[in-house]
């Protein structure tokens, strides 16, 4: 059983960027930073607790790191680099601060359902060394930030043109609308949960605001953010 197979595409992607003349320095700094971040924030806690949920802290803060690195080390037009960095940092902070809040509330002491399902998948694949599979999955998340997620960021941030294309402006507008939508959806759900808690009600369906029209408006908006 090859436990390390999930890492191969990301390692290949990172190696390809490292071998480019334009992005080698960016990729090296970002990749090493991601590995250090994930080792401290994700891999060690997973090793100590056996729970995968710490990925929800490491991955968004990896986006923040990617945004900072791309701004300070890219050779593109400063305003374009700044815009790209701000977009990444805001996306990362939204999820990263939320994850820290969940950790503070003790919610990470229980494995999230999606990670419980991951264990079922491993069992079906014949993977019996769960501790190793957890570490490989966690590292793959950090390598994603170092490879395929970083490629479009580096390309855009390294564009020297001082003029913004119409397509870039359209993309920024879509991002602003989507980011606002998922923020509003999150706030509406938090308010709903607080109201249900005060009323002593449990397992209620959120059907207020944007949640009236879509089962997961925050997920839909998050998908649009990455478009």
Please report, for each region that a protein language model flagged, where it lies by residue.
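Membrane-anchoring alpha-helices and their flanking helix-loop junctions
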Residues: 1-215, 220-227
């Amino acid at each position: 059983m090859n436990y390390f197979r999930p890492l191969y595409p990301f390692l290949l992607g990172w190696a390809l960027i490292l071998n480019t003349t334009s992005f080698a320095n960016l990729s090296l700094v970002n990749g090493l930073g991601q590995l250090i971040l994930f080792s401290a924030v994700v891999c060690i806690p997973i090793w100590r607790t056996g729970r995968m949920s710490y990925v929800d802290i490491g991955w968004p803060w990896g986006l923040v790191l990617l945004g900072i690195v791309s701004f300070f080390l890219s050779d593109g037009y400063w305003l374009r680099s700044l815009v790209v960095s701000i977009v990444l940092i805001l996306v990362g902070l939204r999820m990263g601060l939320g994850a820290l809040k969940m950790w503070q509330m003790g919610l990470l002491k229980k494995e999230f359902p999606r990670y419980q399902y991951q264990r079922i998948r491993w069992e079906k694949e014949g993977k019996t060394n769960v501790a190793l599979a957890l570490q490989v999955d966690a590292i793959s998340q950090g390598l994603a930030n170092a490879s395929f997620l970083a490629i479009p960021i580096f390309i855009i941030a390294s564009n020297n043109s001082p003029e913004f294309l119409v397509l870039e402006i359209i993309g920024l507008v879509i991002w602003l609308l989507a980011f606002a939508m998922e923020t509003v959806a999150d706030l509406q759900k938090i308010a709903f949960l607080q109201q249900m808690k005060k009323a002593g009600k449990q397992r209620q369906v959120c059907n207020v605001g944007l949640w009236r029209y879509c089962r997961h408006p925050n997920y839909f908006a998050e998908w649009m953010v990455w478009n």
